[in-house]
Regions:
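Divalent-metal-activated hydrolytic enzyme cores
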Residues: 1-31, 64-71, 80-82, 97-139
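Short acidic/polar active-site loop segments enriched in Thr and Asp
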Residues: 85
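Short, charged/polar surface micro-motifs in flexible loops or helix N-caps
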Residues: 38-40
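Short Gly/aromatic-enriched secondary-structure transition segments
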Residues: 46-52
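A short beta-strand-loop structural module common to alpha/beta enzyme folds
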Residues: 56-62
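Short beta-strand segments
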Residues: 31, 34-36, 43-44, 60, 90-92
């Protein structure tokens, strides 16, 4: 079974059984969190912080970095449109972005069929936002 079919099946079951409560779009703890998209944090970070559904705006990206405008846009929306008053930047150890190699990324992109001329339009070194030290990345 394709993973999409499995996901759709699980979603249907969830929706059929869901008895949800109405929640505000505004974070109840007035908190925004920028963190890493690492799949090991799923279902782990929020309980570790005592954050429940509706408590915080969780913004995830590769390496919990502010590279480009997307993270800033999400943080600004959380603060100025949705009432967040505090922002946490939370990293973790053994982050896959630490020491990331733009040349390896370029090669992987080419292997997947992305034309070199498209890759050359982006400064991969700054775009990938690699860092060497997880702790320094959040300080």
């Amino acid at each position: 079974m394709m993973i999409l079919n499995e996901i759709l099946e699980n979603n249907k079951k969830f929706v059929d059984e869901f008895e949800g409560e109405e929640l505000s779009h505004h974070p109840q703890k007035k908190l925004a969190i920028l963190t890493c998209m690492d799949c090991r944090l799923t279902g782990f970070l929020e309980p570790a912080l005592g954050i429940g559904r509706g408590d915080a705006k969780i913004i995830k990206n590769a390496g919990n970095t502010i590279v480009g405008e997307d993270a800033i846009r999400s943080i600004a929306a959380a603060i100025f449109s949705l009432g967040a008053e505090e922002v946490l930047v939370i990293g973790h150890t053994e982050c896959g972005m630490a020491g990331s190699d733009p040349d390896k990324l370029r090669n992987a992109m080419i292997e997947r069929g992305i034309p070199q001329e498209e890759i050359d339009k982006v400064d991969l070194k700054s775009w990938i936002g690699g860092f060497e030290d997880e702790e320094e990345n959040v300080i």
